[in-house]
Amino acid sequence: LIERMQQELDDLRMFMDIGEGTITVSETEDKDWVNNWKNFFHQFYIDDLLVTPSWEEVKPEDQGRKILHIDPGTAFGTGMHETTQLCIRQLKKYITPQTELLDVGTGSGILAIVALMYGAGHAVGTDLDPCATEAVRENMEMN
């Protein structure tokens, strides 16, 4: 497979500059990559909203606050990415009971769920990732 890929790169060079075009193969340590990321995802605030992973307990001092429980599973969407946080801040600012939201590429459902938490009348999420459906269902139940 590597030899074939290298040949394809060499053929491509005849038409354009592809830079160095080297292929590197390495072996990675056998870990539970599906769950290992959880070691780095801890509760955090987006303004007044506490985003907390489903496997962490909410601290006593945070009880009574607006809390989003989230577990993306293998779908995308913890809320840690800056663009997600920007979207959440804008949703919080502009949501009304008349708001109808379409969340394309919903992943974990975080944006649709936040919209509903802040009073949107209706939210629909769609995603090509089949894992997203189960993640959204579980996250909706938690919230």
Each model region followed by its residue ranges:
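Short, flexible hinge/linker loops that cap or flank conserved catalytic cores
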Residues: 61-62, 95
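Short, structured patches in soluble enzyme cores that scaffold and shape functional sites
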Residues: 27, 53-55, 72, 106, ...
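Short glycine/proline-enriched turns and hinge-like loops at secondary-structure junctions
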Residues: 62-63, 81
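N-terminal auxiliary segments of SAM/dcSAM-dependent transferases
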Residues: 1-61
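Short intrinsically disordered coil segments
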Residues: 40-41, 69, 85
